[in-house]
Amino acid sequence: MLIFPLINDTSRKIIHIDMDAFFAAVEERDNPALKGKPVVIGKDPRETGGRGVVSTCNYEARKYGIHSAMSSKEAYERCPKAIFISGNYEKYRTVGDQIRRIFKRYTDVVEPMSIDEAYLDVTDNKLGIKSAVKIAKLIQHDIWKEVGLTCSAGVSYNKFLAKLASDFEKPHGLTLVLKEDALCFLAKLPIEKFHGVGKKSVEKLHDMGIYTGQDLLAVPEMTLIDHFGRFGFDLYRKARGISNSPVKSDRIRKSIGSERTYAKLLYQETDIKAEISKNAKRVVALLQDHKKLGKTIVLKVRYADFITLTKRVTLPELTRDAAQIEQVAESIFDTLPEHTVGIRLLGVTMTNLEDKMADIALDLS
């Protein structure tokens, strides 16, 4: 007997677009001399004393086992000939905006998950095209022709399957998962490939002898619920290709922030407050981009000994005024206990966000 009802909406047409090695691909596009060479987006460990992490890398670098979140030091050890590039977020954001405008030609129901991936619901699209595969191919063509980059696309009747499909054939792949093929497609996948199943859950599933979608399909609903609570029911549905989560074109952001890690530790108050100011102005630019105002300002400070302090102040009214955010963030810093070691990381974040297009003066100078 099922504890929760199983409702499977297979009427939708969902596309998941995932840009191929996005940051690295932009750098290769802008500097053709990089093509065919291992490119890592991250600080060169030879210049930082071994500090820093890999943001992303191109497919040539991945041949050496380099991946996102790996330490730059390990990436260099794996591939000493790798070319390290610090990266240019403003440039990547501009390209990301260009790609999103392409999406909007086909549908307004677009849910960006990050700067380089998004879900699109094309069930009722602007051009009246019945085939989601055709739309995915048109988007791939438009992005290549206009932006000079490749992307991978997954097409299915829900977000879960579309996401898995986009990762199935990279780079520049297109995979369709029909409702009649979903169980077979999932059965062959390692459980760690299931989107939304984290590392700890994977370890627990392995302990239960569950390694593939086929293994998961064989486990009774109550067994999964006993081990994982309500998430067990989610696993039960995933094994059957069921996910009715809508594509949310108005996806709510809970916070907007900017933080930076420093290769050279910060000691002087003037330097520290100058960096707080930079982060505050970056937050204001992001608030403006997303048409948001915020009420709570959060300052994050991490010291060289990795002690991290976070403190917040909630304002009486919503704002996105750079001078106010900067002043509050600096005043928060002044209240922190003295620390004898340098600062490794500083971050400013705005939470309690609301949509409000009031005429607010933006001081970005």
UniProtKB/Swiss-Prot annotation:
Query: Which keywords appear in this protein's UniProt record, sorted alphabetically?
Result: Cytoplasm, DNA damage, DNA repair, DNA replication, DNA-binding, DNA-directed DNA polymerase, Magnesium, Metal-binding, Mutator protein, Nucleotidyltransferase, Transferase
Show the catalytic activity. DNA(n) + a 2'-deoxyribonucleoside 5'-triphosphate = DNA(n+1) + diphosphate
Work out whether the entry's keyword set contains Metal-binding.
yes
Which GO BP terms, alphabetically? Answer: DNA-templated DNA replication; error-prone translesion synthesis; SOS response
Q: What is the lineage of its organism?
A: Bacteria, Bacillati, Bacillota, Bacilli, Lactobacillales
| Protein's name according to its UniProt entry | DNA polymerase IV
The record's comment on cofactor binding reads: Binds 2 magnesium ions per subunit.
Q: Where is the active site?
A: 117
Top EC group: transferase
Q: Which GO terms describe its cellular component?
A: cytosol
Q: How does it assemble?
A: Monomer.
Where would I find the UmuC domain in this sequence?
A: 14-198
| Alphabetized GO MF terms | damaged DNA binding; DNA-directed DNA polymerase activity; magnesium ion binding
The role this protein plays is: Poorly processive, error-prone DNA polymerase involved in untargeted mutagenesis. Copies undamaged DNA at stalled replication forks, which arise in vivo from mismatched or misaligned primer ends. These misaligned primers can be extended by PolIV. Exhibits no 3'-5' exonuclease (proofreading) activity. May be involved in translesional synthesis, in conjunction with the beta clamp from PolIII.
Gene3D superfamilies assigned: 3.30.70.270, 3.40.1170.60, 5' to 3' exonuclease, C-terminal subdomain, DNA polymerase, Y-family, little finger domain
| The keyword Magnesium is annotated on this UniProt entry | yes
Essential cofactor(s): Mg(2+)
